[in-house]
């Protein structure tokens, strides 16, 4: 059997040569568990005569990846094989690679189609010695296999389908793309990115340094007008933004309801549903940047709108197709008045914005007065029990995980943009809360700090380093506002006037584990607070320094910060004594700040996978999980747990099988000691009340909002109701992003049992269930404290 080498020569397949190549990449790994010869044996079984060395390396990497559940070092080895393969297939010198990307000729039409901007190439060539020598290629070897494969699939630029960039090239491209001629700043950013202290968001990594640097993740729109022109102008904006790879939040509360009079045609409106189906089809048609991600629109509606019940059904799995829009995402923008009326079991009036105008333009007391005046004037279209609508909301969430829950009054009352007007919606992921109008499309550029990195070897937390890196991130995101490509002019106008940014986090759960703090412990709760105090402090200080150089943002005057009111003041919270807030407030009073908003913990799904961290602010959902790559699915064990079990001599095949059998939980495995059971509780074993409490405690230092998922293994209407009311009373802006559940029953058994039921029995069962759910919901409203104790 022979192998074809990269230069075209043929050579006999030699077992020892393959083993030796793998052995060389095993430095620093735990050789008690990693066995290069075992990988070689498996590789040789899959070979055929005429295999190329590239295919051989790919097979070796995949083989190592399949052994990851034996030990996480196999994932590192798999990545090293794959990275070493990529290094052999790509040019080393950064400036050469950038020239190749610029000189690209499209094979379909023979035209010059540069993949990087001429301005980026010119800067690289003018500074090539410094930039080329600053790159440290060994850092490519620190990715695990699944992080590297994610980069390879979607992030590294390709020439004719073949990857041309190495990960380090991409990070330097991004750094130069942001900082242009400021080479010192570019190299500083490159080092922080490549050492994994933080990461920019996916659109920034995709597009920085290219001809169309659309670096923003989030866009928020409100309807231009309740008219055919307004609806379709807004739709066009959505299409243009989605084409450029932006996720979208759209406020639709101003659109007239079903049956409302249309003066221009002397007809009646069809309401929200047919309009949203048009938006649904646009989302399907226009994906985010050529198949990178599907188009994604979140639709925000206030619960007084007459079409609210139909809105809650739009994502359901059953029902008439023409009453569904399953490719959209749905969110409620909830005034406090609705929550109060649900709590006290009062009536709730549904209205049409055409007949009761302005409700979406006011919040708080002003909203309550206007709403009550419309009720008094008899302009109401329908009256329902507030709890009847609440039941429909809970029912939809139990079935579909949505709508998202955001509290309109908290979002406005605690916003530094409240001087601009009423904020009408959030974004696709519920962490961005920014002002929109018919002339302004809100935008946010994102980055996330890898919180696990700031845990020292002595198990202390390096707040000083966290503040320093936060300041670099602020400067980067602030620069992006000026160099960004905007898909619509209204986005450019908004972003340059208010200059908001969104700094998030990833690896909070990893940081707790490295500090040896169980997620619910008092120590973790204090660290959670101090991490966000530090990020907010560092971000404000950096933004103030920028204002000193460049002046405050255009609409600064009249904002809460301009009056000395910071986010924690709006929550009536006193920070810990970690930082000197008095000095910072004095500095801000003198110079102002450059950015209206700063902090917004987002989901971090893709970038956390690249860096090998747990997502965002989330606890671990399981201690064993599946990672999908193009070549298949791989099971991964939580690497921290595996390290702990290995050190205590408890890691073996049988242990792995027990964890899999327990769905990733270790709580019922007798051999595992209690201290590890506390440390490795999954989200299903952590009190959701604690999760909400920690969200509120960090919320005092988050001037936008946070993507906060609620996990209830088997939700009932009582549990869910008490969760929502607890979050609302804690003052959260986002009460819930997704409701994550686990199926309670085996669906096959469930189907079989259902089949046997007669229609009559089925109807009575459904009625019984509705009664039971209503009773649970009402019980939780009447006995909130007790209900939370028995809930999650």
UniProtKB/Swiss-Prot annotation:
Note on file?
A: Two distinct regulatory sites have been defined: the specificity site, which controls substrate specificity, and the activity site which regulates overall catalytic activity. A substrate-binding catalytic site, located on M1, is formed only in the presence of the second subunit M2. The level of the enzyme activity is closely correlated with the growth rate of a cell and appears to vary with the cell cycle.
Quaternary structure, per UniProt, is: Heterodimer of a large and a small subunit. Heterodimer with small subunit RRM2 or RRM2B. The heterodimer with RRM2 has higher catalytic activity than the heterodimer with RRM2B. Interacts with AHCYL1 which inhibits its activity.
Q: Which NCBIfam families match?
A: NrdE_NrdA
| Positions of post-translational N6-acetyllysine modification | 17, 376
Catalytic activity, EC: 1.17.4.1
Active site residues of this protein: 427 (proton acceptor), 429 (cysteine radical intermediate), 431 (proton acceptor)
Q: What high-level taxonomic lineage is stated for the organism?
A: Eukaryota, Metazoa, Chordata, Craniata, Vertebrata
Recorded protein name is: Ribonucleoside-diphosphate reductase large subunit
Where does the protein end up?
Cytoplasm
Site (Important for hydrogen atom transfer): which residue positions? 218, 444
Positions bearing the site annotation: Important for electron transfer = 737-738
- Gene Ontology annotations of biological process type: 2'-deoxyribonucleotide biosynthetic process; cell proliferation in forebrain; deoxyribonucleotide biosynthetic process; DNA repair; DNA synthesis involved in DNA repair; male gonad development; mitochondrial DNA replication; positive regulation of G0 to G1 transition
Query: What family classification does the UniProt entry report for this protein?
Result: Belongs to the ribonucleoside diphosphate reductase large chain family.
Q: How is its activity regulated?
A: Under complex allosteric control mediated by deoxynucleoside triphosphates and ATP binding to separate specificity and activation sites on the M1 subunit. The type of nucleotide bound at the specificity site determines substrate preference. It seems probable that ATP makes the enzyme reduce CDP and UDP, dGTP favors ADP reduction and dTTP favors GDP reduction. Stimulated by ATP and inhibited by dATP binding to the activity site, the dATP inhibition is mediated by AHCYL1 which stabilizes dATP in the site.
Establish whether keyword Cytoplasm is in the entry: yes
Sites annotated Interacts with thioredoxin/glutaredoxin: 787, 790
Positions annotated to bind ATP: 5-6, 11-17, 53, 57
**Annotated positions binding dTTP:** 226-228, 243, 256, 263-264
Q: Supply the gene name.
A: RRM1
Q: Where is the ATP-cone domain?
A: 1-92
Residue numbers carrying Phosphothreonine? 751
């Amino acid at each position: 059997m022979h192998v074809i080498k990269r230069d075209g020569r043929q050579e006999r397949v030699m077992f020892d040569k393959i083993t030796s190549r793998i052995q060389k990449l095993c430095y620093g790994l735990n050789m008690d568990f990693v066995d290069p010869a075992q990988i070689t044996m498996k590789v040789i079984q899959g070979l055929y005569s005429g295999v190329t060395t590239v295919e051989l390396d790919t097979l070796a990497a995949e083989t190592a990846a399949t052994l990851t559940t034996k030990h996480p070092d196999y994932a590192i080895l798999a990545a090293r094989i794959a990275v070493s393969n990529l290094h052999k297939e790509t040019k080393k010198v950064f400036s050469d690679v950038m020239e190749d990307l610029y000189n690209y000729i499209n094979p379909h039409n023979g035209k010059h189609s540069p993949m990087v901007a001429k301005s980026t190439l010119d800067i690289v060539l003018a500074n090539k010695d410094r930039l080329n020598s600053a790159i440290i290629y060994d850092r490519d070897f620190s990715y695990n296999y699944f992080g590297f494969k994610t980069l390879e699939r979607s992030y590294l630029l390709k020439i004719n389908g073949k990857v041309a960039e190495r990960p380090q090239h991409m990070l330097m491209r991004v750094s130069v793309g942001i900082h242009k001629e400021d080479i010192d700043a570019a190299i500083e950013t490159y080092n922080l990115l490549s050492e994994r202290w933080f990461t920019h968001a996916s659109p920034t990594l995709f597009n920085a340094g290219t001809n169309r640097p659309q670096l923003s993740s989030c866009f928020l729109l409100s309807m231009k007008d309740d008219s055919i022109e307004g609806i379709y102008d807004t739709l066009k904006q959505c299409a243009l933004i989605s084409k450029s790879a932006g996720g979208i939040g759209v406020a639709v509360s101003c659109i007239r309801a079903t049956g409302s009079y249309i003066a221009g045609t002397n007809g009646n409106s069809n309401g929200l549903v047919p309009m949203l189906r048009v938006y649904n089809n646009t989302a399907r048609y226009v994906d985010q940047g050529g198949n990178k991600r599907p188009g994604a629109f979140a639709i925000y509606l206030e619960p007084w709108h007459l079409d609210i019940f139909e809105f809650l059904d739009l994502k359901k799995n059953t029902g008439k197709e023409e009453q569904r829009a399953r490719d959209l995402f749905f969110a409620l923008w909830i005034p406090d008045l609705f929550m109060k009326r649900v709590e006290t079991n009062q009536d709730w009036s549904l209205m049409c914005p055409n007949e009761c105008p302005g409700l979406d333009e006011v919040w708080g007391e002003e909203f309550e007065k206007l709403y009550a005046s419309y009720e008094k004037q008899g302009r109401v279209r329908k009256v329902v029990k507030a709890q009847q609508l609440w039941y429909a909301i809970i029912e939809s969430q139990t079935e579909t995980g949505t709508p998202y829950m955001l509290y309109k009054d908290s979002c406005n009352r605690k916003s530094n943009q409240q001087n601009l007007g009423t904020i009408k919606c959030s974004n696709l992921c519920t962490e961005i809360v920014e002002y929109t109008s018919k002339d302004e499309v809100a935008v946010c550029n994102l980055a996330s700090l890898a919180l696990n990195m700031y845990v020292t070897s002595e198990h202390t937390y390096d707040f000083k380093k966290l503040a320093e890196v936060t300041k670099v991130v602020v400067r980067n995101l602030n620069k992006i506002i000026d160099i960004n490509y905007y898909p619509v002019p209204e986005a450019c106008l908004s972003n340059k006037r208010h200059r908001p940014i969104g700094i998030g986090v990833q690896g909070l759960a990893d940081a707790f584990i490295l500090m040896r703090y169980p997620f619910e412990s008092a120590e973790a709760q204090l660290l959670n607070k101090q991490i966000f105090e530090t990020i907010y402090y560092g971000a404000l200080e950096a933004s103030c320094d920028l204002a000193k150089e460049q002046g405050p943002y255009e609409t600064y005057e009249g904002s809460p910060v301009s009056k000395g009111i910071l986010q924690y003041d709006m929550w009536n919270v006193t920070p810990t004594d970690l930082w000197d807030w008095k000095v910072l407030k004095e500095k801000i009073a003198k110079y102002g700040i450059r950015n209206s908003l700063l902090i917004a913990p987002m989901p971090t799904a893709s970038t956390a996978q690249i860096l090998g961290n747990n997502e965002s602010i989330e606890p671990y959902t399981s201690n064993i999980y599946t990672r999908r790559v193009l070549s298949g699915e791989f099971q991964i064990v939580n690497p921290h747990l595996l390290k702990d079990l290995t050190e205590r001599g408890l890691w073996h095949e049988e242990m792995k099988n027990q964890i899999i059998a327990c769905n990733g939980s270790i709580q019922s495995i007798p051999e595992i000691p209690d201290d590890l059971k506390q440390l490795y509780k999954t989200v299903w074993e952590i009190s959701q009340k604690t999760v909400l409490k920690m969200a509120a405690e960090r919320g005092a230092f988050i001037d936008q909002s946070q993507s906060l998922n609620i996990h209830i293994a088997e939700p009932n209407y009582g549990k869910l109701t008490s969760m929502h009311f607890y979050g609302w009373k804690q003052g959260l802006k986002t009460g819930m992003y997704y409701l994550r559940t686990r199926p309670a029953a085996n669906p096959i058994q469930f189907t079989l049992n259902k089949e046997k039921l007669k229609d009559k029995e089925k109807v009575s069962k459904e009625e019984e269930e509705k009664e039971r759910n209503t009773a649970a919901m009402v019980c939780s409203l009447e006995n909130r404290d007790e209900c939370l104790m028995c809930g999650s």
